[in-house]
C-alpha cells in the first residue's frame, strides 16, 4: 500500500506547465481518451485531468476525474517516471459512460500508457 498516495506535488497546476505540455507534448490517442505527455526534470510524475463541459453534467465530469486520479494513484508503477501527463476524456466516452465501469476505463488508460513505454 505504500506509495499509493496522490500528493500535492504530483498535481500539474501552473499555467506555464500546462502550456509546456500542450506545446511540446506527445499524444496517445484512442476512442475514449487523449493523453498528452512531456518529460519533466523531476523524479516523479505530475498529472492533470481536463474534462470539457460538453462531457456531461458536473456529477459525471467529477466522477470521471476521480476515476482517472484513482487509476493513476493505484497504478503508479505502470507509469514511467519523470513525465507530466494531461488526461482528456473524449466525447465518445460521455455517450457510453453509463455503460462503462471503472475496470474498463482502467484497462483503456493502462493500455495507452504501455504504448508510451514501447
From Swiss-Prot:
Gene Ontology terms: cellular component: ribonuclease P complex
Q: What is its EC number?
A: 3.1.26.5
Residues spanning the membrane = none
Q: Which GO terms describe its biological process?
A: tRNA 5'-leader removal
Task: Establish whether keyword Hydrolase is in the entry.
Answer: yes
Q: Which UniProt keywords apply?
A: Endonuclease, Hydrolase, Nuclease, RNA-binding, tRNA processing
List, in alphabetical order, the Gene Ontology terms for molecular function in this entry: 3'-tRNA processing endoribonuclease activity; ribonuclease P activity; tRNA binding
Q: Name one Pfam family in it.
A: Ribonuclease_P
Domain of life, source organism? Bacteria
Q: Give the SUPFAM superfamilies listed for this entry.
A: Ribosomal protein S5 domain 2-like
What job does this protein perform?
A: RNaseP catalyzes the removal of the 5'-leader sequence from pre-tRNA to produce the mature 5'-terminus. It can also cleave other RNA substrates such as 4.5S RNA. The protein component plays an auxiliary but essential role in vivo by binding to the 5'-leader sequence and broadening the substrate specificity of the ribozyme.
Annotated family: Belongs to the RnpA family.
Q: How does it assemble?
A: Consists of a catalytic RNA component (M1 or rnpB) and a protein subunit.
Protein name as catalogued? Ribonuclease P protein component
- The organism named in the record is Petrotoga mobilis (strain DSM 10674 / SJ95)
Amino acid at each position: 500500500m505504500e506509495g499509493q498516495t496522490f500528493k500535492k506535488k504530483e498535481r500539474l497546476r501552473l499555467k506555464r506547465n500546462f502550456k509546456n505540455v500542450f506545446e511540446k507534448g506527445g499524444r496517445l490517442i484512442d476512442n475514449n481518451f487523449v493523453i498528452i505527455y512531456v518529460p519533466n526534470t523531476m523524479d516523479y510524475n505530475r498529472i492533470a485531468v481536463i474534462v470539457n463541459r460538453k462531457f456531461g453534467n458536473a456529477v459525471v465530469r467529477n466522477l470521471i476525474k476521480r476515476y482517472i486520479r484513482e487509476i493513476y494513484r493505484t497504478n503508479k508503477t505502470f507509469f514511467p517516471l519523470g513525465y507530466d501527463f494531461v488526461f482528456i476524456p473524449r466525447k465518445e466516452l460521455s455517450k457510453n459512460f453509463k455503460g462503462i465501469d471503472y475496470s474498463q476505463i482502467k484497462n483503456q488508460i493502462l493500455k495507452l500508457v504501455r504504448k508510451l513505454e514501447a
